[in-house]
Amino acid sequence: MSTRGKHLFYRDRKEWNDITPVPQDDNGRHIVNIAYSEAFVDAHDYFRAVLIKNELTERTFSLTSEILLMNPANYTAWEYRRRIIKEISSDLNAELRFVARLIEEYSKNYQLWHHRQWIVEELSKQIANGSCNSLTHLSSDELRFTDDVISDDPKNYHAWQHRRWIVSFFKISVEEELAFTERMLLSDVHNNSAWNHRFYVVMLDEGLSPSVLTREIDFVQKRISFAPNNESSWNYFYGLLVPFVHNRKYIYSETSKPSDEKSSSNETDFMPKLQLMLKFVEDLMAVDRTVVDCLAPLSFVVEVYTDYLKLHFMKQSNGGGTLGKQDSPHVDASTGDSLNITYDPKTIFDRAISLCDRLANEVDRIRASYWQYRARQLMCFTKNFNLPCDIIIS
């Protein structure tokens, strides 16, 4: 009998005598033969045969287990296995354990995480009309599982994506996830995955009410003070700005759900926050002179200047006049000298162009073309509103 150690080939198993194996068809055009093991060839020949027959039985379920242990990335095998599971009503909890063992070894495999999500969805359907405690137990188990994987690999994209799905699917409490991200960022403030997860929790699950905005500004500023050149935290900081300039749907009042309506007061209401953000950069530069040459905060200031000008001209074009002096912040981030708040949009425009020039020629020369493009973009934008500009981009 053909065996290798304890392995019994399918061709030698009596219960498979009714199946004619289907060998792999390479059309005779292969340049280099892949050195498949004999067991691999044997199992896949039988797999192709039952797949053609669409046999959904216990033995084909066992066959897919062996196929997937040989190659966990075999999407066809996973899809076939799901059809078998539904047909034979296989134990989904056992299936969770099976895929968990594979994830322990292959944690960055797309097919494994997709299959796990499918299992959780099917399990939730089974217990939908049963005990709420069972559903809570399932969600807790999934959070704990992703926590374990992330603890081993804090930037595992697949685990973070699965956790994001779990939070949305089970409507996990915002407080629980904020605490989780805070713990992860305490461990590594540069963990962009943790910042990204927190952003989605705040924007999609909680909503950016005035009190939430204040809390998150305080949260991110403390992390920036600890690591001023951390691009992830500056991106998060800027992300808090984006809804007010580009997309209203994430903005909540304290008592209402988000709305797509554009409120003429949004821009003005946000200006004190914008001023505080820029004042924070000013103070940071005054305390730590190295920040003046850091790419991340300087890039942040360019974005804030740009968005300020957009808000200013949006209000002007809507017939609301110009933003008043009390609403119009300016920080001279191009020099790092003692900074004064000024109010003239033309001055802000000039400083933005000057900062783009400094980034292109001193701080971020490898992306000089990008910063030159940003300067030209600003000039084209302001020309549409008849803002005079006599700056030549170098």
PLM regions and their residue ranges:
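Residue signature of alpha-solenoid helical repeat architecture, marking inter-repeat boundaries
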Residues: 55-58, 72-75, 107-110, 154, ...
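Structured C-terminal portions of repeat-based eukaryotic scaffold domains
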Residues: 199, 203-394
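Eukaryote-skewed repeat-based solenoidal scaffolds used as protein-protein interaction platforms
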Residues: 97-228
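Extreme N-terminal leader/anchor segments
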Residues: 1-73, 85, 91-92
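A conserved position within tetratricopeptide repeats
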Residues: 48-51, 64-72, 85, 100-107, ...
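Helix-turn-helix repeat elements of alpha-solenoid scaffolds
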Residues: 38-40, 52-57, 88-93, 134-140, ...
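Non-catalytic amphipathic alpha-helical adaptor/oligomerization segments
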Residues: 45, 54-126, 161-162, 166, ...
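Eukaryotic gene-expression regulator signature that favors modular helical reader/repeat domains
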Residues: 96, 149-151, 251-252, 292
